[in-house]
Amino acid sequence: MPTINQLIRKGRKAKVKKSDSPALNKGYNSFKKVQTDLSSPQKRGVCTRVGTMTPKKPNSALRKYARVRLSNQIEVTAYIPGIGHNLQEHSVVLIRGGRVKDLPGVRYHIVRGALDTAGVQDRMQGRSKYGTKRPKDKK
């Protein structure tokens, strides 16, 4: 516990918060070939690998993921949400932040319904999260 005098002399240091999605906090200047501090909510990238991985201990499944090379030249692993997808190597995708709790090292999500990624088929509820259009009413 510091004394009042020590606090007057030094003061308290603010804690630096580390980003949950560091690849979104970097930009890239392709003319100068240098990284910049330009953060953005989403980034575009190209799939370099699409596959499945198994989750951590109590869970069991085959979770779909894609390895994505972003427009700022950083390569990240992103989760593909929803049932079924049309992604393959060289597909152009949009990624957002947000980790997957039971997949170690996966800190990003692919946005469904944007760029080359199709929305989830036959989805009725929570459509906006999966890029699904409103179904036509049957009369």
Curated annotation (Swiss-Prot):
GO MF annotations in UniProt: rRNA binding; structural constituent of ribosome; tRNA binding
Q: Which family does it belong to?
A: Belongs to the universal ribosomal protein uS12 family.
Record CDD domains: Ribosomal_S12 (cd03368)
What does the entry list under GO cellular component?
small ribosomal subunit
Source species of the chain: Halalkalibacterium halodurans (strain ATCC BAA-125 / DSM 18197 / FERM 7344 / JCM 9153 / C-125) (Bacillus halodurans)
Give the protein name, as stated in the record.
Small ribosomal subunit protein uS12
> What segment(s) does the record annotate as region Disordered?
1-55
The record ties this protein, via SUPFAM superfamilies, to:
Nucleic acid-binding proteins (SSF50249)
NCBIfam families annotated for this entry?
rpsL_bact (TIGR00981)
* Polar residues compositional bias, start-end: 32-42
Q: Which GO terms describe its biological process?
A: translation
